[in-house]
Design a protein with these regions (language model features):
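Bacterial N-terminal signal peptides that target proteins for export
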Residues: 1-10
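Intrinsic low-complexity, intrinsically disordered segments enriched in polar/basic residues
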Residues: 2, 17-24
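Bacterial N-terminal signal peptides
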Residues: 9-19
Length: 234
């Protein structure tokens, strides 16, 4: 089992969230862009407890503005927002970020990790720290990792063997490893943004997508791809 990971990125130092020495006339706005909608555990945590804690502990000196479900903009807009200071934090998939450093494609290797403990050992150690620094060359600092869960295939029609899935169009990320893995499974990878996936499944542009359960349900993918294949490959 390999766990789908998200990377929390920032252009700000951790000290940004510490109380200012003097009260300000207006709060400093901290903008956070998230990939998932309200209803997803990660989004609800940041919209709820994280926002409340920061604003209370700083006595209102900081205000947390959350842009969920790519409402700030697409992947490119989020990266540029971090680089130019329009965003202070963002959650993003290593698969997408791998275009800036191929080492991040390690997360697209299927069946690499046996369980959560193995993932935590990897990311809390030397490898995780090195990967967190991989985006500094483009002005982005990796702040930490979020486990979104194990990936399964969500399909608009069922299949029981890989032979039945042959040539089915599957939504893929921009990662070359993810695309190659999908081809190795005998499927036809179709790279597209996560925000376009629901419509693509609804219109039949793709037959399925591999994603964790929380992300699928919060995005209502089960409405257009009701057949769950328990592959557990990521």
């Amino acid at each position: 089992m390999k766990l789908f990971k998200a990377m929390l990125c920032s252009v700000a130092a951790l000290s940004l969230l510490l109380p200012a020495a003097h009260a300000q006339a207006a709060p400093t706005v901290v903008k956070i862009a998230l990939t998932q909608p309200t209803g997803h555990p990660t989004t609800d945590l940041i919209r709820g407890q994280f926002k409340k804690t920061i604003e209370e502990k700083t006595n209102g000196r900081f205000r947390i503005d959350v842009f969920d479900n790519y409402s700030f903009g697409n992947f490119e807009a989020v990266v540029q927002g971090l680089q130019f200071g329009m965003l202070q934090f963002a959650q993003e998939s290593p698969s997408n970020l791998s275009i800036y450093d191929p080492k991040l494609m390690i997360f697209d290797l299927p069946y690499l990790m046996p369980d959560y403990d193995a993932v935590n050992i990897l990311l809390d150690g030397k490898v995780g720290k090195e990967l967190s620094r991989s985006l500094e060359k483009i002005g982005i600092k990796g702040m930490g990792w979020i486990a979104l869960g194990t990936r399964f295939y969500w399909m608009n029609k069922p299949f029981h063997t890989m032979a039945e899935a042959k040539s089915m169009k599957i939504r893929a990320t921009a990662s070359k490893v993810h695309i190659s893995m999908t081809k190795a499974f005998g499927m036809n990878p179709t790279p597209m943004a996560w925000s376009e996936t629901f419509t693509a499944l609804q219109q039949g542009t793709v037959a399925g997508v591999d994603v964790d359960i929380h992300s699928a349900v919060s995005a209502n993918l089960h409405e257009v791809a009701p057949h769950l294949v328990l592959s557990g490959h990521f």
